[in-house]
């Protein structure tokens, strides 16, 4: 919102965007909201990228070309990783229980 002083002695100004000519008053504060609007648009873009990240078919916001399926691959490897460690923990517990039940397995 740009303002041009048409007649500073009479306090008359013109809004450049709309072409409206009006009297300038001391009790009214004029604030430019374009920087705020730019920040809101940037936040909306980040929110859209976060929403798109929930669908594994979409690519990340600032990814290089050819990165389709990145989230799908990451989800698969995450499941394999945690599945491996849960299986190992269960295997250790079963081994400990088997040894406690039958001490002859370790030579005692």
UniProtKB/Swiss-Prot annotation:
- Reactions this protein catalyses: 5-methyl-5,6,7,8-tetrahydromethanopterin + coenzyme M + 2 Na(+)(in) = 5,6,7,8-tetrahydromethanopterin + methyl-coenzyme M + 2 Na(+)(out)
Transmembrane feature ranges = 77-99
Q: Name one GO biological process term.
A: methylation
A GO molecular-function term, please? tetrahydromethanopterin S-methyltransferase activity
Q: In which pathway does it act?
A: One-carbon metabolism; methanogenesis from CO(2); methyl-coenzyme M from 5,10-methylene-5,6,7,8-tetrahydromethanopterin: step 2/2
Identify the EC number(s): 7.2.1.4
Pfam families in UniProt: MtrB
Q: How does it sit in the membrane?
A: Single-pass membrane protein
A Gene Ontology cellular-component term = plasma membrane
Q: Keywords for this entry? A: Cell membrane, Membrane, Methanogenesis, Methyltransferase, One-carbon metabolism, Transferase, Translocase, Transmembrane, Transmembrane helix
- Spell out the subcellular localization from the entry: Cell membrane
Q: What class of enzyme is it?
A: translocase
Belongs to which family? Answer: Belongs to the MtrB family.
Subunit structure, as described in the record? The complex is composed of 8 subunits; MtrA, MtrB, MtrC, MtrD, MtrE, MtrF, MtrG and MtrH.
What the protein does comes down to: Part of a complex that catalyzes the formation of methyl-coenzyme M and tetrahydromethanopterin from coenzyme M and methyl-tetrahydromethanopterin. This is an energy-conserving, sodium-ion translocating step.
Q: What HAMAP family is this protein classified in?
A: MtrB
Question: Can you name this protein?
Answer: Tetrahydromethanopterin S-methyltransferase subunit B
Species assigned in the record: Methanococcus maripaludis (strain DSM 14266 / JCM 13030 / NBRC 101832 / S2 / LL)
Gene name as annotated:
mtrB
């Amino acid at each position: 919102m740009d303002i041009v002083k048409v007649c500073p002695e009479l306090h008359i100004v013109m809004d450049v965007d709309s072409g409206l000519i009006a009297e300038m008053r001391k009790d009214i504060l004029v604030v430019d909201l374009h920087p705020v609007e730019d920040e809101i648009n940037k936040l909306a873009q980040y929110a859209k990228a976060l929403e798109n990240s929930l669908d594994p078919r979409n690519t990340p916001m600032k990814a290089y070309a050819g990165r389709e399926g990145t989230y799908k691959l990451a989800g698969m490897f995450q499941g394999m990783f945690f599945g491996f460690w849960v299986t190992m923990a269960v295997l250790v517990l079963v081994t400990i229980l088997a040894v406690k039940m039958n001490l002859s397995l370790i030579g005692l």
